[in-house]
Curated annotation (Swiss-Prot):
It comes from the Eukaryota. One of its GO terms (biological process) is mitochondrial translation. This is Large ribosomal subunit protein mL48. The modification N6-succinyllysine is found at K198. PANTHER family: LARGE RIBOSOMAL SUBUNIT PROTEIN ML48, MITOCHONDRIAL RIBOSOMAL PROTEIN L48. The lineage of its organism: Eukaryota, Metazoa, Chordata, Craniata, Vertebrata. Belongs to the mitochondrion-specific ribosomal protein mL48 family. It comes from Mus musculus (Mouse). The gene is Mrpl48.
Length: 211
């Protein structure tokens, strides 16, 4: 019995000494005993203070938003008068009571100009105009409000239209003009540029007082 116990203890001591030797060899070579073949399980952690450090980070996935740039103030540019064979800057005015109708036809005119190689300077909306329709009742002399008409206007500004092609271009616009939209083409002037902006009489009075 004592001989058998001595053999078991001797085998166990030999195994422990071999494992200790292999551990020392791994440490001297800089290897990790967990990932090395034949090594014993190493229970120590590589991190001790922040086990969840870096988990759940998302800021590197979100794109950095650029600061919004302020819109540049629209300034009056030099008006191109044109030549004997070519028109200067022309404004195509589209007026309608239905805003969606005026907007869709303005987009059609813009695409048509691009397809026909007519330079489009810009396309913009004019201030909405409101008109009240008054009605005189059968009895009484006081006018009564009958309806309110809202007029929407879009402008497509073009340049470089040749005089020979202008007639054909206007015929195409007239043939595709939807019902309820009024079309007018005229040369661009300084008054047209000022008409783009809404009048602010109170602000103008305050600026006049400050100056």
């Amino acid at each position: 019995m004592s001989g058998t116990l001595g053999k078991v203890l001797g085998v166990w001591t030999n195994t422990v000494s071999k494992q200790g030797f292999s551990l020392l060899r791994f440490r001297s070579l800089g290897e990790n005993p967990i990932f090395s073949a034949g090594g014993i399980l190493w229970t120590s952690r590589h991190y001790k203070t922040k086990p969840t450090h870096g988990i759940g980070r998302y800021r590197h996935l979100v794109k950095v938003q650029e600061p919004k740039k302020k819109k540049a103030k629209v300034e009056l540019r030099a008006i191109n008068v044109g030549t004997d064979y070519e028109y200067g800057v022309l404004n195509i005015h589209l007026t309608a009571y239905d805003m969606s109708l005026a907007e869709s036809y303005a987009q059609y005119v813009h695409r048509l100009c691009n397809r026909l190689s007519i330079k489009v300077e810009e396309s913009y909306a004019m201030p909405t105009k409101t008109m009240e329709v008054m009605r005189l009742p059968d009895q009484g002399n006081k006018m009564v409000l009958d309806s309110v008409l809202t007029t929407h206007e879009r402008v497509v500004q073009i340049s470089g239209l040749s005089a020979t092609f202008a007639e054909i271009f206007l015929e195409v616009l007239q043939s595709n003009l939807p019902e309820g939209v009024r079309l007018s083409v005229r040369e661009h002037t300084e008054e047209d540029f000022k008409g783009r902006f809404k009048a602010r009489p109170e602000l103008e009075e305050l600026l006049a007082k400050l100056n």
